[in-house]
Regions:
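A short beta-loop-alpha structural element at the N-terminal edge
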Residues: 1-14
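Conserved acyl-donor/pantetheine-binding loop and adjacent beta-alpha core of acyl/acetyltransferases
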Residues: 46, 60-152, 200-202, 217
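Structural signal for hydrophobic/aromatic residues that build the beta-strand cores
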Residues: 52, 142-145, 164, 175, ...
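Conserved GNAT acetyl-CoA-binding A-motif
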Residues: 120-124, 138-140, 167-179
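Conserved acetyl-CoA pyrophosphate-binding loop and the N-cap/start of the following alpha-helix
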Residues: 151, 155-160
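Conserved active-site alpha-helix within GNAT-family acetyltransferase domains
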Residues: 158, 170-172, 181-203
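C-terminal helix/juxtamembrane-tail motif
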Residues: 205-218
Length: 218
């Protein structure tokens, strides 16, 4: 899954976070290992992972896409999100300053759209080949959505997003996403609407979008 995440991010932000100037023959595998470690840590912290697999001709199962969803905070109930964030060992190939700027920008976008307490009751947050997505107390939060480039346009991304939308709809909550140019058409096709001007994310335009289920407010 760490390799898949790296393949899904081969262009755009991946080149900013893992610039050529920091790449060496000795650290080429650090990026996938770092992504895998972050995924496993989040799983151990109690987050929910939803995985799409593709059965190969030989009967093996090849992961072609995955999404990782955070459930919303329940009032009065302690959750892993209440604990101090744990730092992962960052690889030498990662531009730590660029990662810090990225997180700062994403936080500002989410606070502007969701309000200062928006993160407190997030359902899920997503950063992916298709999108960077956030969902709040109004919403769901898709932590990670990645689809192997060799298997895109086969419906895997739609399945992963649809799953989270169904969870949010069951609770009568909205879904807020920050969509990359690659992900925007998918979200538009699934009923999301732009709610603000595009935002520059380290040189790449991203669009804040919102989906409101028919059950919202009922």
């Amino acid at each position: 899954m760490g390799v898949l995440g790296t393949r899904a991010f081969q262009d755009g932000l991946n080149r900013v976070l893992f610039p050529p100037r920091l790449q060496t023959p000795g650290n080429k595998d650090e990026g996938p290992a770092w992504r895998a470690a972050r995924i496993l840590r989040r799983m151990r912290e109690g987050r929910t992972a939803y995985v799409v697999v593709d059965a190969a001709d030989d009967g093996s199962e090849t992961v072609i896409g995955y999404a990782q969803w955070d459930r919303p905070k329940v009032p009065g109930q302690d959750t892993p999100q209440d604990e101090p964030a744990k730092e992962d060992d960052t690889p030498s190939s990662l531009d730590k300053e660029a990662l810090a700027r990225l997180n700062e920008i994403l936080d500002k976008i989410a606070v502007t759209a969701l309000g200062p307490d928006g993160f407190q009751s997030m359902w899920c947050r997503c950063s992916a080949s298709l999108t960077n997505s956030y969902i709040s107390n109004l919403n769901s939060d898709l932590v990670i959505l990645s689809v192997d480039p060799d298997h895109q346009r086969r419906g895997a991304g739609r399945m992963l997003v649809q799953w989270g939308m169904e969870q949010a709809a069951a609770e009568g909550k909205k879904v807020f996403v920050i969509a990359t140019p690659e992900g925007k058409p998918l979200y538009e096709a699934m009923g999301f609407e732009a709610i603000a001007d595009p935002v520059d994310l380290l040189g790449f335009p991203n669009q804040a979008m919102l989906w409101i289920p028919t059950s919202y407010g009922s």
